[in-house]
Amino acid sequence: MAGCHRMSAQALVRLLMVAMSVVVGGLADWSPLLAAPQSSSESTGPVIVGRILYRGPVPAPTQLQVNRDSDVCGTTITIASLSVDVATHGLRNAVVHVDLAIGEGPARTVESSPAVVRNTQCRFHPHVAAAQIGDEVQIFNDDPVMHNTNIIVENSTALNVAMVAGGNPIKKRLKKLGLHLVKCNVHKFMQAYRVVFDDPYFDQTTETGQFSITGVPPGLHRISVWHETLGVMEKDVQVPARGTVVVDLEYK
């Protein structure tokens, strides 16, 4: 979702480091113009894998009464704030991100598919997702009733569009970093989350809490984990030039 956005101090430092390495013939091994041919494993760098766990009590799902468009939405909506695999304690829908240390090199450029938000049976699908700044988001209404997609970032409206039944999808570029709260003003119980980063070093946990992040530059980096109910936790990890780093983190 490319768009004009103010360059952060970290991004400016990275840019200056790139310029200096080109001028002095430094170690810009990641540059396709300067680097010698590499194998696929060398070019992607190390892999960070792990699991996000939760061993605490899991609250029972909440049942909400539906008082509008119940023929499509149903008479009740089930809201489950935590999804935990009983066998492994793996936590689903946690977003894991590697915060690069300043001066560790530029963010890797990757091709990304459009981020899709679907209004289906009066729910946003997916409920949680992560994306990169500049990615395209495509919003669909699959229901025979009108919806409204209202995206809020830092208490400001980033997007507010009506989604008529049978209408064309809305296509926009993500231009704001951070946590995006997605709501429907027509059906107040509809809510979802998008987390937008300025680099591709992120992943979302599976049903068993697993994640995998590739191509991270070597160095001491901070891994941050976000969950809609449990909040944020962090851990500093030393990433080698190659190989696999295993990081398991647990919400208490």
Residue spans for each PLM region:
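Extracytoplasmic copper-binding redox domains, predominantly the cupredoxin/blue-copper superfamily
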Residues: 34-252
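Hydrophobic alpha-helical context, especially transmembrane and signal-peptide helices
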Residues: 10-12, 16-17, 41, 200
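N-terminal secretory signal peptides that target proteins for export/translocation
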Residues: 1-12
